[in-house]
């Protein structure tokens, strides 16, 4: 068992429990807790997101073998947004409104998260977002479980600027034309300015 899987096993049940206790959508009379899984199983993001779906199914199965959670069995409801950003919003609405999930684990890219955010806020759903993100967003309907630039990119730059990191003086900020790199590079550029680095 790798370290990441071990950490996920230790934290998924408490995270789900905390999320469910905070969520107004939990049906106290139901015998099951429905968990939405909103990860691409086809398209360009399937190579990354299928692993997350498989991990969630494994963790749900293991938790059910231990008697479930809060005295209830966990039931996975899996949908495939097919790496299609508008379809993410449609599938999120389906999970919350039609399938009546209590909590959802999903999305990978920032654009998929931004696509579903209005749906989760409108329907008062709860989303656990599993990867690093660019920050500059906060919602009571989302648990952002990954690092933001101030927790990841800025410490890396500080290290590279230090003597131990090589005392870097010149910087080139690269990235694809996409939400995460654009926003992270904007944050890093401002940070570098505070350290006296010129454009």
Which stretches of residues belong to each language-model region?
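Structural motif
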Residues: 73-98, 152-155
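Bacterial N-terminal signal peptides that target proteins for export
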Residues: 2-15
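Sec/Tat signal peptide C-region and signal peptidase I cleavage site
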Residues: 25-29
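Bacterial N-terminal signal peptides
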Residues: 12-24
């Amino acid at each position: 068992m790798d370290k990441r899987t071990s950490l996920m096993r230790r934290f998924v049940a408490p995270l789900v429990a905390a999320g469910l206790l905070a969520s107004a959508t939990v049906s106290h009379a139901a015998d099951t807790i429905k968990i939405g899984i909103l990860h691409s199983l086809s398209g360009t993001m399937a190579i990354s997101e299928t692993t997350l779906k498989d991990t969630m199914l494994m963790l749900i199965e293991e938790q059910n073998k231990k008697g479930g959670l809060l005295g209830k069995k966990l039931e996975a409801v899996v949908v495939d947004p097919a790496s299609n950003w508008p379809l993410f919003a449609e599938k999120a609405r389906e999970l919350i409104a039609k399938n009546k999930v209590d909590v959802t684990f999903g999305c990978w890219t920032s654009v998929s998260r931004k696509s579903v955010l209005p749906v989760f806020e409108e329907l008062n759903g709860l989303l656990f977002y599993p990867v690093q993100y660019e920050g500059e967003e906060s919602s009571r309907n989302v648990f952002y479980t990954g690092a933001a630039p101030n927790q990841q990119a800025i410490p890396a730059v500080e290290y590279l600027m230090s003597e131990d990191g090589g005392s870097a003086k010149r910087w080139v900020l690269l990235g694809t034309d996409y939400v995460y790199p654009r926003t992270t590079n904007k944050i890093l550029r401002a940070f570098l300015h505070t350290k006296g680095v010129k454009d």
